[in-house]
UniProtKB/Swiss-Prot annotation:
Superkingdom of source: Eukaryota
Function: Acts as a component of the essential kinetochore-associated Ndc80 complex, which is required for chromosome segregation and spindle checkpoint activity during meiosis and mitosis. Required for kinetochore integrity and the organization of stable microtubule binding sites in the outer plate of the kinetochore. Participates in SAC signaling that responds specifically to disruptions in spindle microtubule dynamics. The NDC80 complex synergistically enhances the affinity of the SKA1 complex for microtubules and may allow the NDC80 complex to track depolymerizing microtubules.
A GO cellular component entry from the record: nucleus
Family: Belongs to the SPC25 family.
Coiled coil: 44-106
Species whose genome carries this gene: Drosophila persimilis (Fruit fly)
Name of the featured protein: Kinetochore protein Spc25
GN (gene name): Spc25
Length: 236
């Protein structure tokens, strides 16, 4: 009996050990499965992270390329802006110089016109000869006032082609050889001009009468030549 009981006790102990071993193995398998699942999730997460990183790197490369292109475009625009600013400054300076030159020419022209008008007025007063300026330079129309010693006034009208040298010479000679007071004043003005060495004011180009061989040694320096191209507001 005692041996039987001892044998039963050994079997029971052996059973408990086997049961414990199986239980431990089951727990280990369960842990391995859990660890495997976790490892699989971690591996998937790592793969997803790598793919996300690769996508971000591609996007970053694209953005970097776009940024580089925009920086280059900004540099080109900045360079163009500087060039345009320099060109604008040069244009402004040129316009300022042209305005100053135009103002100077306008002032000189106005001064010259005033001088010619004053000269014309003086010659008109001295010679008693008045010209219709609206007809110039095509025609030389006007009237010469001759005052005799007894006070009588005689009006001598004239109408000549602006390019008729013979007609202009004849008019000059008739005015120059007059004996009235106006003619003497005129000759005094001419002699004063010759003494002062002043050059006659003459029109340019085709407006100036050309001397012919008949009068090659005598070219009139008169109000006719002075005012062929100069406007005036004096009454004709």
């Amino acid at each position: 009996m005692a041996d039987l009981k001892a044998s039963e006790g050994d079997l029971s102990d052996y059973y408990m050990r086997l049961k414990k071993i199986f239980s431990n193995e089951t727990r280990l398998q369960s842990r391995e499965a859990s660890i495997s699942k976790r490892s699989s999730r971690v591996h998937k997460n790592i793969i997803s992270a790598k793919e996300a990183i690769e996508r971000q790197e591609r996007d970053f490369g694209k953005l970097q390329k776009v940024l580089l292109n925009r920086n280059q475009e900004l540099e080109r625009r900045f360079t163009l802006g500087e060039a345009l600013a320099q060109q604008l400054e040069v244009t402004r300076q040129r316009n300022a110089d042209m305005e100053a030159q135009l103002l100077r020419h306008t002032t000189e022209g106005r001064q010259r016109s005033n001088e010619l008008m004053e000269c014309m007025h003086s010659l008109k007063q001295a010679t008693g000869t008045y010209i219709n300026h609206e007809a110039l330079p095509a025609r030389l129309n006007g009237v010469s006032v001759v005052r005799a010693d007894d006070g009588d006034i005689k009006l001598i009208p004239f109408s000549l082609d602006g390019n008729d040298a013979d007609g202009l010479h004849t008019l000059w000679r008739s005015l120059h050889t007059r004996t009235d007071n106006n003619a003497s004043k005129w000759r005094k003005l001419i002699s004063d001009q010759e003494v002062a060495g002043a050059s006659p004011v003459t029109p340019s180009g085709s407006e100036r009468p050309k001397a012919t061989s008949k009068h090659s040694n005598f070219m009139p320096t008169s109000i006719i030549e002075i005012d062929l191209t100069s406007p005036t507001n004096d009454a004709s």
